[in-house]
Amino acid sequence: MDSIGTTIRRLRRWRGLSLEQLAGLSGLSKGYLSKIENERTAIDKRSTLVAIAGALRVSLSDITGDGLEIRDPQADTAIPAIRDALLSTDLDGAEPPIGDLSQLLSETQLLAALRQANQDAEVGARLPELLMALHTHVDKPEALRSLVTATHTTALLSKGLGAFELAWIAADRGHEAAQRLGEPGWIALAEFARTQALSGLGAHKRAAKLAERALEYVPADAYDVRGALTLTTGYTESVLGGDATAALDEAAGLAEHVEYGNENFLLFSPPNVVLWRISSALERGDHAEAARLAATVNPAELTIDSRRTTFLIEHARALYGIRRPDEEVLALLIRAEKLGRIRTRTNPFVREIISTMLARTRREGVAREVRGMADRMGLLKTA
């Protein structure tokens, strides 16, 4: 897998653009773009990726890659089956019921929990059958609710495996099920899933619009869903260059009302709000604030491996941004990799950090660790 800088240079030349032209189209400086292409600096903002992709007229995944070489082959084989399950089903209820509904409801809950535990291969293997079966029970409200949850799980799994368009198809199917159900809380939950899929596609303006719309009708006492949507508006505001403070403060207040932080598998809790604050600070380029916030978080309080993995990655990004020693950054990334191998190795910002470190290769001891991780990420061949 090529580094992001190498990919950008290849795409720029393919488009027949000079560095000056790309700078003009993206709003970034020629010097900064040159450093990115030559792996002398790491891209540390999603907005930067979006700007470059827009200037090159390519998708975000064309730049970040789909991680095919380094993803879990067992998990990856599920993508075609999931696609078939979604494209061969609808909500017309014409098919005879498959399976016992109570067992399907339990399976939905289990797979959502397993995805949060980074068990991608297991979840991917079992999702297609579950999706097919749930579509045959759509005359029952509980099946529609379960379908909203199952498609949300599907969207997040697909997004994590680089199948961004499939993530949108899954999330949109869940929204269709929620609309059929007609319950505002579930419609808002499904809308949140759509915002996550859109963010994976780089469509942050659209994600913000959907989140803001859902906040108009989500029940006042649905603190977890309201909080997740509010966090989305805050983060997208950061990506779009705005001020996320008000939204993040509001989310923090909502989190105080939540007794069980993983309702609807959203992990909406005070520590998770801090994690979103860290991500927002990183997007603003305020690495010092991100590092300060990260120092206040006990990863154990995040309770699920998927969020712990994300926290370790964001903490590493913050430390890298304030030029802490490579050893400290690597230690966090290696911990993240142990918790969530694929989530860590396919993260574009992790790849950028490792690519830049690899190009520098400081001291021998650090270089050995960098090369090891770069090899596991499929980057060593480009060094």
Question: Residue spans of the language-model regions?
Answer:
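Short basic helix-loop element that most often maps to the first helix and adjoining turn
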Residues: 6-25
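Short C-terminal boundary/hinge segments that cap the last helix of small helical domains
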Residues: 57-72, 273
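DNA major-groove recognition helix of helix-turn-helix/homeodomain DNA-binding modules
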Residues: 27, 47-62
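Short, charged recognition helix plus adjacent turn
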Residues: 65-95
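Conserved binding/catalytic microenvironments
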Residues: 96-108, 112-383
